[in-house]
Amino acid sequence: MLKKTPETVSDSDDAEERGSERRHRIHPLTIIRRIFGNAVFSSLTRRILFFNVAATVVLVGGILYLNQFREGLIDARVESLLTQGEIIAGAVSASASVDTNSITINPEKLLELQAGQSITPAPNDEDLSFPINPERVAPVLRRLISPTRTRARLFDADANLLLDSRHLYSRGQVLRFDLPPVTPETQTWGDWFTSMFNRMLQPSSLPQYKEAPGGDGSIYPEVMNALTGVRGAVVRVTEKGELIVSVAVPVQRFRAVLGVLLLSTQAGDIDKIVHAERLAIMRVFGIATLVNIVLSLLLSSTIATPLRRLSAAAIRVRRGARTREEIPDFSARQDEIGNLSIALREMTTALYDRIDAIESFAADVSHELKNPLTSLRSAVETLPRAKTEESKQRLTEIIFHDVRRLDRLISDISDASRLDAELARADASPLDLDVLMKGLVDISRQISTKKKSVAIDYVADRKAGAKTSFVVNGHDLRIGQIVTNLIENARSFVSEESGRITVRLSRHKDRCIVQVEDNGPGIQAEDIDRIFERFYTDRPASEGFGQNSGLGLSISRQIAEAHGGSLRAENVVDKYGVISGARFTLSLPAAETHER
């Protein structure tokens, strides 16, 4: 059994802490995926639908949660009940019967009252007594309350219940009472959902409504305030969550409070109106969601479908190794998908071109390597049958020559094969061609003392009075390789006695031009384009066979094109139309487009 040492325990604790830290750094999108499942996010169409519908749900939820319709409706109902209560209280006060034999009115006390002060008698003050006669008030209260669904209760000066509109019946009225169910009511899922929905949208805590036991109105704060002459309103909620709005209005006669009129809405009246308003919002939400889904599907068809076609085409390109697969063309869209389509088409074309180039290069390499190998094989097979020392010496020289030729070919092929990768990895930097050309010409002049001695001139064409910039972005070694190849190529074709090579640097708009011109025999018209082909050689008779691989000009053009430039060849013709030499022109994009 493996026992944990303190070191292993501490290491495991550190690992657990690091794992805990990684768990705490979970991306929010990962959390959403865990909640809703990966299926929601497995397709761009489903993502568009999910986020668009989610945005609509959040919007409607915010509207329902922050909607002020309910509060406005409650305020309007309070004002309506207060106005209605003032009218009913005035009618009740006018209908109250006063027994003048048992009332003593002190005029001086009336004159001592201030504005707004009530003459409600104190418990030990029996100077003023205005009793309300329920029998005379009941018909008036019933007629005023009947057109509305408002409940009215009348309390006397001691907050005792005198009348309740629930128990006021007119003559001939048929009474109907709902009996309680035989079995207790069970809450359905619909009722539970509605209750939870209302609780979420009505988070404010309201006092619970209770019936006054024994008609004692003192449990209602608004009734007690009304006994002091101040009207008030209170909003309560029943056990079922239904709203009840109550207002208390003092019943006054001769500025004396005779009692209190308490008006209350029926439980659920306001909730029904709010529910209807929310139902209308939900209908609009349903229509908006349906429209959102349709628009999301249309949006998905314009985004996901083209992307799906591009993806399928890319897979066909990967699998179709022998045939050229066509990438769908969405360039007419003129948007990001159109740009992606153009990029994929160009990338695919470049890929196929590269495949063709590799196949062609492999075929050329195979062909070029077979020639020296065939010669080498023949020499090796013939060497044992050679009878004279002279024949053996000549065959040995052929073998050495073919080996050197193979070595040169393999080196040039290796250089050409890794050229693209090297240019892709290396970072281009600003390079002054004027400085580079001067250095290359100086080196070539020094080489002339060891090889064929020819005159090499360098000319930088600048505008009068201006300092022309010859700066380009590139790789100095590779651009130097182009110019060196052109100079050495020209050296091989000019005569040693009168040979001359001119390197000229100039600027044309946003291009830097390097020209290498010689006074040799020129180029055959049919060979001007072929000289840039791989392994093509057309060397002067003075050079031995196999001294050149034929890759120099091909590599030079490849380097120029990798820098966004070009390399071309032409003949120099004098005024008589006679070819007087060859000219190679290297064009590179300038790093700056202005002159300073």
Swiss-Prot record:
GO terms for cellular component: plasma membrane. It is an enzyme of class 2 (transferase). Residues 69-283 are periplasmic. Signal peptide: none annotated. It is a multi-pass membrane protein. It catalyses: ATP + protein L-histidine = ADP + protein N-phospho-L-histidine. Coiled coil: none annotated. The chain crosses the membrane at residues 48-68, 284-304. Its EC number is 2.7.13.3. It is found in: Cell inner membrane. GO terms for molecular function: ATP binding; phosphorelay sensor kinase activity. Pfam families: HAMP, HATPase_c, HisKA, Sensor_TM1, Stimulus_sens_1. Residues 1-22 are annotated as: Disordered. Keywords: ATP-binding, Cell inner membrane, Cell membrane, Kinase, Membrane, Nucleotide-binding, Phosphoprotein, Transferase, Transmembrane, Transmembrane helix, Two-component regulatory system. InterPro entries: HAMP_dom, HATPase_C_sf, His_kinase_dom, HisK_dim/P_dom, HisK_dim/P_sf, Sensor_TM1, Sig_transdc_His_kin-like_C, Stimulus_sens_dom. Residues 364-592 form the Histidine kinase domain. Residues 301-356 form the HAMP domain. Residues 1-47, 305-596 are cytoplasmic. CDD domains: HAMP, HisKA. The modification Phosphohistidine is found at H367. Member of a two-component regulatory system ChvG/ChvI. Activates ChvI by phosphorylation (Potential). This is Sensor protein ChvG. The lineage of its organism: Bacteria, Pseudomonadati, Pseudomonadota, Alphaproteobacteria, Hyphomicrobiales.
